[in-house]
Amino acid sequence: MNPRRKSRLKIVLFILIGVSIASGLVMYALRSNIDLFYTPSEVVNGKQNDASQKPEVGQRIRVGGMVVAGSVKRDSKTLKVQFDVNDIGPSITVEYEGILPDLFREGQGIVAQGTLIEPTVLQASEVLAKHDENYVPPELGEQLEKVHKPMGISNTDLTGESERDQQEKESR
């Protein structure tokens, strides 16, 4: 092999190694910043009721559901708050330290992002409340439809519309 080809081969190999290292670092960075979305039922039972697809303790996840009435516990000396979130199935406990959104209240839909510190306890770094009574995050809406359709619950049941509201609409 002549010297010219050797130098070209070295340059090509150097570029390939550099691109490979850069790609590996990008993939590693993306992997550590991806937060998977779960419903409380999926945290407890695993996605599609498959225990092998449960999130692991220490994993960063996002959980969406409704704040269980009567479950909000506030520490009077700090900004620590603890509350339960559920869909139709089991609940999980969310622990958060900070100022909650103005729209946060019991019975309200929320999305909490954080780290799972126990199989059913999420240490939240961020809590988001939905902005009006009919809004459901797209991911939560899809998950709720998957969970509720087999149970025979209609989409109107998921909107939170009462029987009285439905009767008033029908009478108009």
Swiss-Prot record:
Coiled coil: none annotated. It comes from Actinobacillus succinogenes (strain ATCC 55618 / DSM 22257 / CCUG 43843 / 130Z). PANTHER family: CYTOCHROME C-TYPE BIOGENESIS PROTEIN CCME HOMOLOG, MITOCHONDRIAL. Residues 141-172 are annotated as: Disordered. Keywords: Cell inner membrane, Cell membrane, Cytochrome c-type biogenesis, Heme, Iron, Membrane, Metal-binding, Signal-anchor, Transmembrane, Transmembrane helix. This is Cytochrome c-type biogenesis protein CcmE. Pfam families: CcmE (PF03100). Residues 1-8 are cytoplasmic. Its main location: membrane. HAMAP family: CcmE. Heme binds at H131, Y135. The chain crosses the membrane at residues 9-29. It is found in: Cell inner membrane. One of its GO terms (biological process) is cytochrome complex assembly. The keyword Heme applies. Heme chaperone required for the biogenesis of c-type cytochromes. Transiently binds heme delivered by CcmC and transfers the heme to apo-cytochromes in a process facilitated by CcmF and CcmH. GO terms for molecular function: heme binding; metal ion binding. One of its GO terms (cellular component) is plasma membrane. Residues 30-172 are periplasmic. Residues 161-172 have a biased composition (Basic and acidic residues). Belongs to the CcmE/CycJ family. It is a single-pass type II membrane protein.
